[in-house]
Design a protein with these regions (language model features):
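Residue-level signature of transmembrane alpha-helical cores of multipass secondary-active transporters
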Residues: 48-52, 64, 76, 107, ...
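Transmembrane alpha-helical segments that form core, pore/gating elements
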Residues: 1, 28, 86-92, 124-183, ...
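Hydrophobic transmembrane alpha-helices of multi-pass small-molecule transport proteins
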Residues: 28, 89, 101-121, 176, ...
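Cytoplasmic-side transmembrane-helix entry/capping segments in multi-pass membrane proteins
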Residues: 43-51, 99-111, 159-167
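Specific transmembrane alpha-helical segments of multi-pass solute transporters/efflux pumps
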Residues: 29-75, 79, 115-116, 201-219
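Helix-helix packing/entry segments at the starts of transmembrane helices
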Residues: 18-19, 56, 60, 75-81, ...
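Juxtamembrane helix-entry segments on the extracytoplasmic side of multipass membrane proteins
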Residues: 9-18, 40-45, 119-144, 181-199, ...
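Hydrophobic/aromatic residues within transmembrane alpha-helices
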Residues: 6, 16, 66, 78, ...
């Protein structure tokens, strides 16, 4: 919602995403620098670079461009599919985590909801928007996050936490600055309200990423992402209240399928933990 409110105010998306990622990196450097410089090596940095590209660069850039075509509420629905796609990618590339028949069924149920959503063409915007463009961009970002859940899970077992965390953000800052230059980004002067919202995004990023990084070391990649199912309910109504976004009935139909998918995934995960 904060991202889209800045776009609505006319702040350039290239500036928003580059500044947000750069500020997070600056603050994390203050906190992690000592451990980072004492522990970093080529292997750790390369692994951090890959995960940072998947977890930060890809979703950071695709999500903000998606918001030019779909509502923040609709984007939150796409974000809620991260656990579903995590199951998919775990099945393909991460053999250490068991994927049961019930989890596979949950993925197909969630995909059915997405198919219905795309068939509707609803964007959540009063000026129509473009579901194909916005939806595909959002899904690309989701794939990056789903894959990063797997690399985070594998690498965080032996790479020191602060070293791994800062390597990801440093790499993402470099990628973003390169994109800023290539895409012709320009530095903008923000008013007080815009600066506060951008600062809010920065601190939300730090909190969310730190919490995720703590849980991924202790729980499975699939279970860690289940919190993403809470996002759409809040996102839809916050966008409706503060940004005058449109709530379409198909959103709730899609969420129904996604929540069934959630129930099956949680049931299976709880069984495996027992």
């Amino acid at each position: 919602m904060l991202n889209r409110s800045l776009l609505v105010d006319g702040v350039n998306e290239i500036f928003v995403v580059t500044t947000r990622i750069s500020l997070v990196t600056f603050l994390l450097t203050i906190y992690c620098a000592k451990e980072f410089f004492s522990e970093i090596n080529k292997e750790y940095f390369l692994k951090g670079t890959l995960t940072g590209f998947l977890a930060i660069t890809i979703p950071g850039w695709t999500f903000i461009y998606a918001l030019k075509s779909i509502s923040s509420g609709l984007q939150s629905i796409f974000i809620s599919t991260i656990p579903m796609f995590t199951v998919f990618w775990v099945f393909l590339v991460y053999k250490e985590e068991k994927i049961t028949r019930l989890k596979v069924i949950s993925v197909f149920i969630g995909l059915s909801g997405l198919i219905l959503l795309f068939a509707s063409g609803a964007t959540g915007l009063s000026n129509d928007g473009d579901l194909v463009t916005g939806g595909l961009l959002a899904l690309i970002g989701v794939q990056g996050l789903a894959l990063s859940n797997i690399t985070n899970k594998k690498d965080s077992q032996y790479i020191p936490a602060r070293t791994y965390l800062l390597a990801q953000w440093i790499a993402s800052t470099v990628f973003s600055l390169i994109l800023f230059y290539i895409l012709g980004g320009e530095v903008e002067i923000l008013n007080r309200s815009q600066a506060l919202r951008l600062s809010g995004l920065v601190f939300i990023d730090i909190f969310n990423y730190s919490l995720f990084f703590y849980t991924i070391k202790r729980l499975s990649a699939t279970f860690t992402t289940l919190v993403d199912y809470v996002v759409p309910i809040v996102g839809i109504y916050v966008g409706y209240i503060f940004l005058d976004e449109v709530i379409n009935n198909i959103f709730f139909v899609t969420l129904f399928f996604i929540f069934i998918s959630l129930y099956l995934a949680v049931k299976d995960e709880a069984r495996s933990l027992d």
